[in-house]
Amino acid sequence: MGEDQKNHLKAYGVAFWLLDKQQSEVLWLLNYQGGSFMSAYSSKLETECKTRGVSYSVISETAANQIESEIANPSVNMNMVKLLNAPKIAVYSPKTKQPWDDAVTMVLSYAEIPYTVIFDDEVLNGKLPQFDWLHLHHEDFTGQYGKFWASFSTAPWYVDQVNETESMARKHGFKSGRELKRAVVLKIREFCMGGGFLFAMCSATDTYDIALAAQNTDVCERMFDGDGISPSAQQDLEYQHCFAFKNFTLERSPYAYEFSDIDVDPTRRNVSEETDLFTLFDYSAKWDLIPAILCQNHTRTVRGFMGQTTAFHKDLIKSDILVMGENALLNEARYIHGEIGKGTFTFYGGHDPEDYQHHVGEPPTDLNLHPNSPGFRLILNNILFPSAQKSKQKT
């Protein structure tokens, strides 16, 4: 899985296939040649690698034992983790087509990793415990419909989104989309508390925490939920309910394409596409196993990419949250992780790792052009994370 791998993304799909279809043991060699996978040889496996265009090496048992000995050496920053089973993956997404792509469903489809699309019905009807891993992407859990009202209030897709959400709210006995999304947020919290793995990108990161903090107040203006925002909405925020963020300030204007100051302001970042980068931390694979798994890559420097939520102001991140990827000069975090109850969550800023500034209505990214994308690899690390046999973080 180093620089000579022809298709990093599909390699994850082969590992998933081994777990799912062959019930074969897969070893994840952390920090060994870019985080490689090792499994017992079979002609089916070799054929699968060839079919998917994944680079591989057939080695002897002696060579495999030598690799294991090298990794076990206390002086090297490597580790070997068993992948135990194929996680059951759910993607929270409307069943109707959206005018933007979803990086996770794109890379899952490209890597040939199966997933199930669920939405409000399934969440509120108690289906989440059927899954190990849940993805949230370009979603607005505050009930403000992505704050697209100012620019797209008459667009057919926006009108349909509002109508569908309000219909769903009435179906479940709620007065507004805001109340519906609050109930969904609390169900997702239950899923995590019970041991589920949550992965969120773009606006699903900050709006999830905002909705948790605002569960006992109203942060929506009249055009979103039929009544006005609570005059004391800011003062009524309960940050203790948040997964990752603290002390943020709401963006109350319905004309502003922001939810709060959690997200960095693109107009103030003073960075170009060429210089917009973030760095992954080099964790100890033996002692800090969880972040080491989530940061496996063939490079420590990853190209940045924008989204409605691009990156997080570090000053607004809770002290017990791991910042795994950052731009230190800009004081912003891009990739963070934490524990909640028996489960975990990972938040990843930005919309599409290979489309720097994805706009509404643009065609989806063709991953055939980006088979070695470091940004997409981070997503796939999270996909296999629930399968890994791991111990508690030591430092």
Question: For each predicted feature, which ranges?
Answer:
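Extracellular ligand-binding/catalytic regions of CAZymes and related secreted enzymes
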Residues: K6-M38, L316-T395
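Structural recognition of the beta-strand scaffold that forms the well-ordered cores
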Residues: W28, A90-V91, V117, L134-L136, ...
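Helical hinge/lid and interdomain linker segments adjacent to catalytic or ligand-binding clefts
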Residues: M1-G2, K6, F37-T47, Q98-T205, ...
